[in-house]
Amino acid sequence: NRPEILDKALLRAGRFDRRIIVDRPNLAGRYQTLRVHTKNIKLAEDVDLHKIAQATAGAVGADLANLVNEAALRAVRLGRKAVNQQDLLTSFELVIAGTEKKGTVLTDTEKRIVSYHEVGHALVAALQKHSQPVSKITIVPHTSGALGYTMQMPEEEKFLSSKEELIVELQTMLGGRAAEQVVFGIATTGASNDIERATELARKMVTQYGMSDKLGLMALSTVSNPYLDGSTMMNCADSTSSAADEEIHKLLMDCYEDAKRLLTEHRALLDEIAMYLLTKETITGDEFMTYVNAENKKLTDGSEPAQDEQDAEAPASPDVPQEDAPSASD
C-alpha cells in the first residue's frame, strides 16, 4: 500500500520489475465476482446479476460477498428457498445505507423537511441532462445516520466525466439544501454530508481537473497515495491557494443558485412529489418519474399549439422567423 516509502535500491531494475495493481473491479469483474459468490446459492428466475453488478459501481469483492450473504439471509427470513432480485437490491441498500432505524421517530415538521430535501435532490437531477436516473427515494431513517436518501443508479459504467456532468452532480448534491431554502426559508444540518461531498468534488474540479475559468489548466494539488486515504497536498503559492478557495466557493454558490432556480420554477411539481413521498415514505424511481413525465407532458402540450392554430396565428410575411417554443428542460 505504500510503495513510495520503499528504499530506491530495492526498486532498481532487475529486482521488482512487475507491479500488480489490485484495484476495485470494473463491471465485468463485479459480475464474475457475483457469479462466484452465488454459485452455491439457489437463485430465482428473475435474478439479473448484470443489473446488480451495474448498480454496485465502486464495490470491492468483500462488499459483494456481504451483499450476497445478506440477500440469502433475507430470503430465509421471509421463508423462501431461493434468492430473488429484490433480495439482492434490498441487501445492496443495506450495505450502503444500513438497516432502518425503527426507533427513530421524527416530528411532522422534520418529516416534511426531509421529504422536500430528498425530492430536491431527485428533481434537480431529473430536470437536467447528464444526470444519473433516480431509482429510489426514502425518508425512512437508517443506521448510517441518514434521515433519508435518494438513490441514483448509473445506466452504464463510465470512466470519464465532462465538466457539464460534474456541474450537474454538484447541483444535485446541493438540491436538498436548495429545497429547504425555497420551501421553508431555512438551512438545516441535514445537508452537512451533501456540502462535504460537494466541496470535495468542487475542489478536485479546480485544483486537479483544470476546470476553473480563472485559474485555467493548472494542477494545484497532488494526491499523496490513492491506495490509502487519497489525501491531497497543495503545491502552489499561498496567494494561488486563496484564489483556488475563492473559485471553489464561487462554483458551489453558482450551482446552489442554479438548483434553487430550478426548484422555484418547478415549485408545484416539488410540492406534489414531496407530499406523495411524505405519505408513502419510500417511492421507486418509476413512481417519481411518473410525476416528472406528466409535468413535462403538460409543459409540452401547453407550449405547442395545434397546427391549425399555428397557421392561423402565423404572420402574413414569411420572412419573419418564429421563435421556438420552450422545451420542458428549459
Place the predicted regions along the sequence by residue.
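Short regulatory helix/loop adjacent to the ATP-binding pocket of P-loop NTPases
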Residues: 3-15
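Short pre-active-site segment immediately N-terminal to the catalytic Zn-binding motif
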Residues: 102-113
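Flexible beta-alpha connector loops of hexameric P-loop NTPases
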Residues: 19-27, 41, 58, 156-162, ...
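Conserved C-terminal "switch" segment of AAA+ ATPases
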Residues: 8-9, 22-89, 94, 98-99, ...
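A short beta-strand-to-loop transition that corresponds to the Sensor-1 phosphate-sensing loop
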Residues: 1-3, 25, 127
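Soluble catalytic regions of large protease machineries
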Residues: 113-116, 122-330
